Amino acid sequence: MDAVSWEYWSELGSGFVDAILLLVTGDPETWTIIRQSLVISITASVASVIPGVPIGAWVAVSSFPGRNLLIAAFNTGFGLPPVVVGLILSILLLRHGPLGGLNLRFTPPAMMVAQFILCLPIVINLTAVAVQQLNPKLRLQMRALGASRSQLMWLLGREIRLPLLGAYMAAFGAVVHEVGASQMVGGNLPGSTRVLTTAIVMETGMGHYDRAMACGIVLLLLVGVVAGLLTWVQQRDAYR
């Protein structure tokens, strides 16, 4: 191994050790970034479940003109580019824009709104799919017993509670690692709108690889936990 390679690997190893130390010793800046990421992404994903589950269930059990068009729109939203969401919200939140009076630009609530928009189609789609996969006789039986539409929605929700958990975890996983919308509407302000993904981009650009790697380690752990929970939900649901 030549001197250049040795120096490279030595610096990389030193940076990794420093990254672990930042996490273990409770570095205030690093843990503030972690906390902000979790607060913003959890709030946005939980909020998306409130309208997303009823809408998804309603679309699945209803028949009306334009239903397929609505489903296609939700499917399009499933792959909505975060940078496009960030661009649209940034324009709306400009000082003289339609929502400029709210003074939300470069604030955590603006990031929550952006992530909510990204989460909502995911929750709607996965809820609709879960309801459609139920035995049709179950819905007919509920209606025959006199269940109202609201009671029907509640009973269907109980039947698909594991897929609903999977829908939430998928939504959370989708936004916790996105960077485009968060950067554009949040501005990456320290102690306020700086989250794991935006911090990684900034710290890498500045050559602060220790903090960038610390944030990267936490982000990988979060994604790993989400993937593990999704796998558990899928396998448990498969053997019900």
Regions found by a protein language model. Name each.
Residues 28-59, 168:
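Transmembrane alpha-helix signature in integral membrane proteins
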Residues 51, 74-82, 104-128, 158-166, ...:
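Faces of alpha-helical transmembrane segments in polytopic inner-membrane proteins
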Residues 55-89, 139:
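Cytoplasmic-entry segments and transmembrane alpha-helices of multi-pass inner-membrane transporters
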Residues 25-28, 183-224, 228, 232:
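Interhelical loop and adjacent transmembrane-helix boundary motif
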Residues 121-139, 143-146, 150, 154-155, ...:
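C-terminal transmembrane helix and the adjacent membrane-cytosol boundary/short C-terminal tail
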Residues 1-17, 64, 229-240:
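Transmembrane alpha-helical segments of polytopic membrane transport and secretion proteins
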Residues 3-21, 28, 85-117, 185-189:
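Membrane-interfacial helix termini and adjacent extracytoplasmic/periplasmic loops
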Residues 65-70, 143-166:
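Amphipathic cytosolic juxtamembrane alpha-helices at the membrane-cytosol interface
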